[in-house]
């Protein structure tokens, strides 16, 4: 993930400024912004401060002929960048430097940038849908929608940008749509969709096929696992079966449908010497030839997008508190955070969490340089 490759892809982003007004190169402004965010910057002034503190370092990678741009210039330029071109560069960069395994599970999930709404301009908060390689903990693509409800139309657009051949694509119930299933199959991938009330007939078929007695004593391929932590004990039972004859009609509606899958969670909460038992049942459909154990691994991997991406964005990078909203800036800044997470995640030399890596990058130029040049990265 060398910086040189990234900047090569970024160089195709068009700069719409009038040439005679350009005091700072677009590539320099983006280079500064990316380095600053890797080092913990959360806003425009933070980025300017980073630049003023590290001018000699930045000149090793960019021109900065007229010095470091002020925060107003950074904000104005970044907010005018085409999000479509930026996302294209991001995806091409990831394709160039990251080879995904055919066994990878790609989790597609959305996240609302809570403070990106602009009341004065009557603009709602934006919703960013990310494609996350659970095997490598890397963001491999992203696209913006104006509302969560628009995920249904945005997911196919995101899939168009990705190479998903041989991969399993997971989504929540919002993404459980026949058109999306067909698209994934046409692109050579497999799907694993959560099923809820938005697919009424399918959900009812599951309830009839898997009554409580079946869940307690499954007749199909099953796999159980248990976990104890924080005064809580959880047993997860996973059941997988072929589509039975009485439900064969669903295979004509859902392209490639092979398996019906059920995940049952029995959770015991130990409080004041009493055990409270909770049971949760979740249904899934899949075109992949899954065993119960592989199904358990796939849905567990799907939740990596929450704790290895969304949690990091909110807790470590304070994304939910970010009030950047000028022009296209909120969407662009979200993408730059993804770049920073990918670069730092791939550093295998310094064994530490994201927050500590960001602090080290801010304090240690040698470490920042090693991260940017890709030395020691897998």
From Swiss-Prot:
GO terms for molecular function: DNA binding; transposase activity. GO terms for biological process: DNA transposition. Coiled coil: none annotated. Pfam families: DDE_Tnp_1, DDE_Tnp_1_assoc. InterPro entries: ISAs1_transpos (IPR047647), Transposase_11 (IPR002559), Transposase_11-like (IPR051698), YbfD_N (IPR032806). Belongs to the transposase 11 family. This is H repeat-associated putative transposase YdcC. It comes from Escherichia coli (strain K12).
């Amino acid at each position: 993930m060398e910086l040189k490759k990234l900047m090569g892809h970024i160089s195709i982003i068009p700069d719409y400024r009038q040439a005679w007004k350009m005091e700072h190169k677009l590539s320099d402004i983006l280079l500064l912004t990316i380095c600053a965010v890797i080092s913990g910057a959360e806003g425009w002034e933070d980025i300017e401060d980073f630049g003023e503190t590290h001018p000699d370092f930045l000149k090793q990678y960019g021109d900065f002929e007229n010095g470091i741009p002020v925060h107003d210039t950074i904000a104005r330029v970044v907010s005018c960048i085409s999000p479509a071109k930026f996302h294209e560069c991001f995806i091409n960069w990831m394709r160039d430097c990251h080879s995904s395994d055919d066994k990878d599970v790609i989790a597609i999930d959305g996240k609302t940038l809570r403070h990106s709404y602009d009341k004065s301009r009557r603009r709602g908060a934006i919703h960013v849908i990310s494609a996350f390689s659970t095997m490598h903990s890397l963001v491999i693509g992203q696209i913006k929608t104006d509302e969560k409800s628009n995920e249904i139309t945005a997911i196919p657009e995101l899939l168009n940008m990705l190479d998903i051949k041989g991969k399993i694509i997971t989504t929540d119930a919002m993404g459980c749509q026949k058109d999306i299933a067909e698209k994934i199959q046409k692109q050579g991938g497999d799907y694993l969709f959560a099923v809820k009330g938005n697919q009424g007939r399918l959900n009812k078929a599951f309830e009839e096929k898997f009554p409580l007695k079946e869940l307690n004593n499954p007749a199909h391929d099953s796999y159980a696992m248990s976990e104890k932590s924080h005064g809580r004990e959880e047993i997860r039972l996973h059941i997988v079966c072929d589509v039975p004859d009485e439900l064969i009609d669903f295979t004509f509606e859902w392209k490639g449908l092979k398996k019906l899958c059920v995940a049952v969670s029995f959770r015991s909460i130990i409080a004041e010497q009493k055990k409270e038992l909770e049971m949760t049942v979740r249904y899934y459909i899949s075109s992949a030839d899954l065993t119960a154990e592989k199904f358990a691994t796939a849905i567990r991997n799907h939740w990596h997008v929450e704790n290895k991406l969304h949690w990091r964005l909110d807790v470590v990078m304070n994304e939910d508190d970010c009030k950047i909203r000028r022009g296209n800036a909120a969407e662009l800044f979200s993408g730059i955070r993804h770049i920073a997470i990918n670069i730092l995640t791939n550093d295998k030399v310094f064994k530490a969490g994201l927050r500590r890596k960001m602090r080290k990058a801010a304090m240690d130029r040698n470490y920042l340089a090693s991260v940017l040049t890709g030395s020691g990265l897998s």
